[in-house]
Structures are given as C-alpha cells and as structure tokens.
Amino acid sequence: MGGVFWIPLRMLEDGQLPGTWAAFGFFSSAAALLAPLAAVRRHFLRRAGPGLVITGLLVGGGPVLFVNSLVLTDVVRALLLFYLTPVWSTILARLVLREAITRWRVIAILLGLAGLLILLDVEQGAPLPRNLGDWIALAGGFTWACASVRLRARPQVHSLESLFACFACGTAVALILALLPFAPLAPLPPWDIIERSAPWVVLIGAGFLVPANFLIVWGARLLSPGRVGLLLLCELIVGAVSAAILADEAFGVREVIGVVFIGGAALLEIARRQPSVKPFPAAL
C-alpha cells in the first residue's frame, strides 16, 4: 500500500489539497463506506468489546501519523523512521507474545534495514529524530508495530470489525492532527479545492485503502508481527519501481542493490517456520 500511496498524495497536493486534510478525507470516506456493513455486523462489534477501540486507534493511527510526517519532514527521513517497524515489532512480540528472537530474524532485520538505507541513499548518518515530523514518523512506525502485535494477539476478532475500527478511529486521529496548531500543517483549504478533490479522495479512500487495509489486517492476524514488519518493507520496492516508471526518478545500481537486500530479507523470513502464540481473551 505505502509503495504507491505517494501517487495520489502527490496528485492531490498538486491540486492544492494538503496531505493532512487528504488523510482525513481518505479515512472518513472509507469509514462511511464501511458504516452500513458495521451496522449489519453490530453484534460482532459488541462482542469484540471496548478493546476494539484500542485496536482501531493503533491500526488507524499508525498510517495517519505517517502521512502527517510527510508534511512535516523530509520524505526520506519519514520513510526511514517509519520503516523501523520490524525492529519494534520483533521486540514487542517477544515481550507480549513471548515469541523467540532467532538469529535468522536478526539477520533478516539487518538485511532489510541495510537495503532500506541503500535504497534511500542516506548520507547524513543514523536516522535519529531531529524535528517534530521525524518524531511523528517514528511514532507512526511504533504505533503500527503495536497494532500488528495486538491483531496477532486477538485473532478471534474478525478482520472486518478491526477494519471498521481502523478507519473510524483513524478518522478521529486524522481530524485531531489536522486541527492542531502546528505551523507547517495547512489550514482547511477553500471550498472549491475541497469540492474539486472530493471525488478523488473518496475513490482513493473507499476504493483503494479499504481493500488494501483489509488484506493487511487479515494477514496481521495470522502472521508474526516481526514477519509482517519485514514484509511491509517490500512496499519500498514497489515505491522505488513505481517512482522510476511514473516520475522518471533514478533506478540504477544502488537502487537494484537496495531492492535485492530488502527482497532477500523478505525471502529469508518467509523461509522460516512461523512461531505460534497464545491469543489474548477477547475482552482485552
């Protein structure tokens, strides 16, 4: 999903709709699309319990934080800090789910992060947070790591309920961030810009984010959080290739090496047997 998400964001920003408000539009339109289904499945929503709100805040909050970080810091730094997710996921899975951290997982993470650094051509040292946008990107990656652990720990909650919670709670997070008095975040754009952008926002939110996030949520219920984080690194491969094709950006030897490293990390992880976990009670 993240590998091609830059395309609609760039298109909407060219149309003068800030990314902050685009994120709110994406999530609110997706939540509106899923609302009738949620009403039909209200029994399952009630059975999932109030803990579903926590799941929604984590699953929806991570991507919203990432989109906002793109507005507040350099894209490369936002990507680097957000995609530290495999590290957090592996540590949290060990603490919460008691998954073993094997040497092969460590090798896969190091290989993936090396590919990340090569692909993004980092020349300014370690990706440490330096400004508000950096911290938001880091928080977004950590939030998504928490989300993947929670989804894995509660497989008895159906993906549809988690998906609706993701967009409903993500809408609230996006609105709060859009209204915060951060100077770099743009105010609500004029009505003519909103009206012109609305069809694209609805199409992207309801037509793209809903199926993409359903697959991610469904997979996260079944896979180890660390594995999910490593597989999501492959989004950067899609991003690099799509940027080279559609935006005429460079794709040379360095990019090929980065792609090979990231792909190798994913293949190494897939080749391993997945650990089992003991699910949490549905009330948590």
Regions of interest found by a model, annotated:
Residues 19-36, 108-111, 135, 150, ...:
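Hydrophobic alpha-helical transmembrane segments of multi-pass integral membrane proteins
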Residues 1-4, 41-77, 82, 118, ...:
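Specific transmembrane alpha-helical segments of multi-pass solute transporters/efflux pumps
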Residues 38-39, 85-110, 237-256:
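C-terminal transmembrane-helix exit sites in multi-pass transporters
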Residues 1-21, 65, 110, 126-153, ...:
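Glycine-/small-residue-enriched transmembrane alpha-helix faces in small-molecule transporters
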Residues 25, 79-84, 151-170, 209-245:
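Helix-helix packing/entry segments at the starts of transmembrane helices
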